[in-house]
Amino acid sequence: MGRVSFVLRLGIFSILMAWSVAGPALVRGADQAPQVPPLRVPVDQLDGIQRATIILDSYSYTPNHLIVQAGKPVELLLTSITTITPHNFLLKNEAAGLSIERDVGAGRTVTVQFTPMKPGIYPFYCDKKLLFFPSHKEKGMEGTLEVR
């Protein structure tokens, strides 16, 4: 009986130690966007449009920080890779003349076109939410458009 008790206690201790090391990272990582460096969106030499693709996943945009040039058109391809959860893309700043709100259904792709005229840093986010649960923005689905 003593050997079984020791093995059982050792097993429980091992599980608790593993959870104390890996558990917080697993829980924290569930709702946070992956760390991706800012994307400098290139200007197409043929038509002058700045094009980028943003992947919408479970509560994240990738990339979540884009750098564009003021006064040049921007075209964003918003691609949802979720199978059930719909998302949206909101980029609103009245002073900068930005008012974009597009729904992106699960597994769908939509295109957003605009021309940012005023340099600055502008947040974009998803405001979808289910009942009393936190919104997608509250779960980390937000990003930054940096206009230079």
Question: For the regions a protein language model found, what residue spans apply to each?
Answer:
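Non-cytosolic beta-sheet module surface loops
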Residues: 56-58, 78-82, 116
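N-terminal edge beta-strand
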Residues: 43-73
